[in-house]
């Protein structure tokens, strides 16, 4: 090597169209999801989400459920079936029907509701709960329903932040008996 410094040619990044809230909303109405919008604009899905939150865009059902999530859960907790079913329950309550769910997701949610009802249980979160068989990621356990649980599917404890909308999201659907009696 001669000792001379080699300079690499710097190729400017291709310019991209600025992402705006109106463009995001327009594409959502046309059926694009956030991942597809991100790919179109060369940004991350999180950037699309950030634009929507920052500039007052319409939130997706999942985002509303996340906004009202009753606990400060971390990455390993989302591996838990209990976490996933409660998230599905929140989406059902927000939409008011199964129309946005696959048949498989609907079946799993109905089965979960039936287990909670038949065994008279609620879901409790405590970050100190270690993972155990059937509860990957830890943090969750099923506990017997108490009078203090009222109509909620969750146990309110020192780790719970229950918003007014969350109180509606994390309660039984009004027509739960009818839903569970469907074949």
Curated annotation (Swiss-Prot):
GO terms for molecular function: DNA binding. Keywords: DNA-binding, Transcription, Transcription regulation. Residues 34-53 bind DNA. It comes from the Viruses. Confers immunity to L5 superinfection, required for maintenance of the lysogenic state. Binds to multiple asymmetric DNA sites. Regulates transcription initiation at an early lytic promoter, Pleft, but also affects downstream gene expression at 'stoperator' sites in the phage genome. This is Repressor-like immunity protein. The gene is 71.
């Amino acid at each position: 090597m001669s000792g001379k410094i080699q300079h690499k040619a710097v190729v400017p990044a291709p310019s991209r169209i600025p992402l705006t809230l109106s463009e995001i909303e327009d594409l959502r109405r046309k059926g694009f999801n956030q991942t597809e919008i991100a790919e179109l604009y060369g940004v991350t899905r999180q950037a699309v989400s950030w634009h929507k939150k920052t500039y007052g865009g319409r939130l997706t059902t999942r985002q509303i459920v996340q906004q009202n999530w009753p606990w400060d859960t971390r990455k390993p907790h989302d591996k838990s079936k209990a976490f996933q079913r409660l998230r599905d329950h929140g989406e059902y309550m927000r939409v008011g029907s199964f129309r946005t769910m696959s048949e498989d997701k609907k079946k799993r949610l109905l089965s979960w509701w039936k287990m909670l009802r038949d065994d008279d249980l609620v879901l409790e979160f405590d970050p100190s709960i270690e993972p155990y068989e059937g509860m990957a990621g830890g943090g969750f356990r099923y506990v017997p329903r108490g009078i203090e649980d009222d109509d909620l599917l969750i146990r309110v404890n020192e780790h719970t932040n229950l918003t007014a909308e969350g109180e509606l999201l994390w309660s039984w659907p009004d027509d739960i008996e009818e839903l569970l009696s469907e074949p």
